[in-house]
Regions:
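An N-terminal RHG(E/S)-centered segment typical of histidine phosphatases
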Residues: 1-46, 54-55, 62, 70, ...
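Generic beta-sheet signal
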Residues: 3, 151-162
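Active-site metal-coordination segments of metallo-dependent hydrolases
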Residues: 20-29, 122-132, 179
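Phosphate-coordination/substrate-recognition cap region in phosphate-metabolizing enzymes
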Residues: 37-112, 182, 197
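Glycine-rich phosphate-binding loop signature in dinucleotide/nucleotide-binding domains
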Residues: 43-45, 145-154
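Short beta-strand scaffold positions
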Residues: 51-52, 136, 157-159
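Acidic, low-complexity terminal tails and accessory targeting/binding regions
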Residues: 84-102, 151-153, 165-211
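Short glycine/proline- and acidic residue-enriched helix-loop micro-motifs
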Residues: 102-133
């Protein structure tokens, strides 16, 4: 199995999602980075593409798929790939948009696009998600990947820096996920060799700059 990991491009109000002010749209920079990422990946042949069920994560995915020469791949949305504290964030966003006395004209679209599979916001905890809980999500994702998909598959994961770092740490057999945190629209690539994973590249951002 070969696994390529990347992250979505920068999204609007990226620095204050915990306040419920974030939008599901990519920023201009995020769109540009996603387009350059798509150009870098256009010749790749993927069997499966996994992404989070947030709107902006799916936007980067759609831009990548649109640019692929070989489009015979399956896109799978997976809540395990959400960013840390995502449910708390989206609950606050929904409350802010619903209770606002002057609703934003795009409120309904934003709410419906926060989740691709469902527009139902799940019950959330009032406390921050722990690193152990994020680790469990990463382990659950990898367990499903290894047990439900062919070992000969080439897989693209469009996650976020935190969840990707936990996934990479698991592949590398490391307990220190912080050393594997990556940049938006970067590329990290791993190939299975027997019982271990060979790192082919990590946090590569060369494709984001004009050559």
């Amino acid at each position: 199995m070969r696994i390529i990991l990347t992250c979505n491009g920068e999204y609007i109000n990226a620095h204050c999602p915990s306040l419920g002010h974030c939008n599901d749209r990519l920023s201009e920079k995020g769109i540009l980075s996603s387009l350059r990422l798509a150009k870098e990946l256009k010749n790749q042949i993927f069997d499966y593409i996994f992404c989070s069920d947030f709107g902006y994560r799916r936007t980067t995915t759609d831009l990548i798929v649109e640019g692929l020469i070989y489009k015979n791949c399956k896109i799978i949305v997976d809540a395990n790939l959400r960013e840390k504290d995502a449910e708390i964030c989206t609950q606050k966003i929904k409350e802010n948009l619903t209770q606002s006395s002057d609703p934003h004209p795009e409120s309904s679209q934003i709410i419906s696009r926060l989740f691709i599979k469902s527009d139902i916001v799940p019950t959330t905890k009032n406390t921050s998600e722990s690193s152990e809980q994020v680790l469990i999500r990463a382990q659950n994702f990898l367990h499903q990947l290894f047990h439900n998909y062919p070992s000969s598959s080439t897989v693209l994961i469009i996650g976020n820096p935190i969840i990707n770092s936990f996934i990479i740490a698991q592949l590398r057999g490391s307990s220190n996920f912080t050393q594997y945190i990556t940049s938006p629209c970067s590329l990290s690539e791993y190939e299975q060799k027997g019982n271990s994973w060979q790192q082919l590249r990590f946090n590569d951002i060369s494709h984001l700059y004009l050559k």
